[in-house]
């Protein structure tokens, strides 16, 4: 085994550990006796002024001032909850998710993620967009106040802006738009199905992800 405890070891690890972390880090590497006293734990960060209900799990992510996060919610690795954003209960923010914040003007609307929603990895939701209860947002979806959120499940498309309806399953898409230089594809979001409201939430979510092959 290689003992850790010097500054060089910290550079190799890329992060620091606290004294209460189990001594085994990875096969072949263990902390030297007393080394934990020299190291500092780096957990997720909730800034002073944020409110997290009991039972919130924050991986190495960040919750900014004024944000509200409900019980049972997971803020996964490198996910960011912006200032004054409102995250409901039992929400899952996957790795790298960006939830936009707003401090001013005071009349601006914060991003709201309602209870039970699932936000896939690297999704970005900003400018006061609201995600309805138990909606599923696929990986890499970008939602702004002006993003066209197009329901393509019926014979005619239905366009939403600023709000994802409850239990909607959303993936990235594009639509044609004419410019002086020609016609180009611009980003949009597509509602491709509905998460069942009549079955257990967890079972329903897993089935939706399979049925629609939604990347998360």
Predicted regions and their residues:
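Solvent-exposed, flexible loop/coil residues
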Residues: 25, 29, 35, 43, ...
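Generic secondary-structure transition motif, activating predominantly at the C-termini of alpha-helices
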Residues: 15-18, 29, 60, 195, ...
């Amino acid at each position: 085994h290689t003992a850790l405890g010097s500054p060089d070891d910290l550079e190799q690890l890329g992060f620091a550990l606290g004294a209460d972390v189990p001594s085994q880090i990875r096969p072949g590497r263990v902390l030297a006796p007393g080394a934990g006293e020299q190291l500092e734990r780096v957990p997720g960060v909730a800034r002073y002024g944020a409110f997290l209900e009991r039972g919130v799990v924050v991986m190495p992510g960040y919750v900014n001032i004024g944000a509200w996060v409900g019980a049972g919610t997971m803020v996964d690795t490198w996910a960011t909850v912006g200032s004054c954003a409102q995250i409901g209960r039992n929400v899952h923010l996957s790795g790298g998710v960006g939830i936009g914040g707003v401090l001013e003007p005071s009349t601006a609307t914060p991003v709201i993620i309602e209870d039970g929603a699932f936000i896939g990895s690297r999704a970005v939701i900003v400018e006061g967009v609201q995600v309805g209860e138990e909606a599923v947002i696929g990986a890499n979806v970008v939602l702004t106040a002006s993003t066209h959120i197009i329901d393509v499940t019926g014979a005619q498309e239905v366009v939403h802006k600023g709000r994802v309806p409850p239990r909607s399953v959303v993936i990235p898409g594009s639509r044609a738009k004419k410019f002086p230089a020609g016609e180009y594809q611009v980003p949009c979001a597509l509602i491709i199905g509905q998460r069942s409201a009549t079955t257990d939430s967890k079972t329903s979510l897993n089935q939706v992800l399979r049925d629609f092959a939604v990347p998360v």
